[in-house]
Structure formats: C-alpha cells, structure tokens
UniProtKB/Swiss-Prot annotation:
This is Adenine phosphoribosyltransferase. One of its GO terms (molecular function) is AMP binding. CDD domains: PRTases_typeI. It catalyses: AMP + diphosphate = 5-phospho-alpha-D-ribose 1-diphosphate + adenine. InterPro entries: Ade_phspho_trans, PRibTrfase_dom, PRTase-like, UPRTase/APRTase. Catalyzes a salvage reaction resulting in the formation of AMP, that is energically less costly than de novo synthesis. It comes from the Bacteria. One of its GO terms (biological process) is AMP salvage. The keyword Glycosyltransferase applies. Its EC number is 2.4.2.7.
Length: 170
C-alpha cells in the first residue's frame, strides 16, 4: 500500500513558505490507518517493548493503537500544565525559540524498554527532548517510529545512534 496516497499536502500552512503534510486522510481511511499501525507493530515486535511513548497530539493517535496491539503501556508526552501529577521536563529548540515538554515522573520504570511513536520527524527537537526524559527516568530506548520524515530538516541527527523506522519520506 502506498501510504503517500493518504497524505494531503498543504502549501503555505501554517505560515508562508511551509509545506504541511496532513495525516488526517490516512487516519480517516480504516485500511490505511491499520496498515500504518501494523507496519510499526511489525517493526516493534522484535524489540521487546514494554512502553510506547507518544508526544501530543498526533503521537497519541499513532502510539495508542501500537501499544494496544503490542500489549504494552502508553505514556503521553505533553506541553507544560497538561499532566495532573508530578512531572519531569525537557526543553527543546524550535525555529523561533525554546519550548518545553513534560511527562509524568512515574511514567517509565527503570529498565523498561521504550519505543517513541509519533506522526512526524521534522527538526528532531521533540524526539530529542522525549529521549532525554525517558533516559532520565531510567528507560532503555528500543527505538523510534514515525509515519513521516521531512528529510531535508535532518531530524534523524537528533536521534543519534538509536534505531528508527519511517513509513514515508518527503
């Protein structure tokens, strides 16, 4: 199945000069959505994953069904002020400044094998901050999986030597 057939391209969104890759059509098509989830599950199966971590919000959409299929837990990564209990945080650089991500301080137990699942790998800031928090909690990085990678932004450099899977490259 060619998943790119289910990605909408919107020019100059959210601002001039940006090409936005919209995964909504993929999510709206049951066959394409399940195919994408199965591809990530297949990648994760041999990694003996205990926990899926997904950054908000589209990481939830992709990560939760992967966790369900694997019989693993799911831990959300959110912006500050969105999680109700004690959190840890990590800062990351965006195009115009610094932002912060958080996750519950008890989300990962030491030694748990963790797979990060998200819709998009762009500059890599989100995944780098997420890796930092997982390692701070004693988690073992099993890898990362993304629906889409924007190759020209070199986000893969922020993943370092960790294994990762991408379903579509742009």
């Amino acid at each position: 199945m060619n998943l790119k057939d289910y990605i909408a391209t919107i020019e100059n969104y959210p601002k001039e000069g940006i090409t936005f890759r919209d995964i909504s059509p993929l999510m709206a098509d049951g066959n394409a959505y399940s195919y994408a989830v199965r591809e990530i599950v297949q990648y994760a199966t041999d990694k003996k994953v205990d926990m899926i971590v997904g950054p908000e919000a589209r990481g939830f959409i992709v990560g939760c069904p992967v966790a369900f299929e694997l019989g693993x837990g799911f831990a959300p990564v959110r912006k500050p002020g969105k999680l109700p209990r004690e959190v840890i945080s990590a800062d990351y650089e965006k195009e115009y400044g610094v932002d912060t991500l958080t996750m519950h301080a008890d989300a990962i137990k030491p030694g748990q094998r963790v797979l990060i699942v998200d819709d998009l790998l762009a500059t890599g800031g989100t995944v780098k901050a997420t890796i930092e928090m997982i390692e701070k909690l004693g988690g073992v990085m099993a890898g990362c999986a993304f629906l889409v990678e924007l190759d020209e932004l070199n986000g893969r450099e922020k993943i370092g030597d960790y294994d990762y899977k991408v379903l579509m490259h742009y």
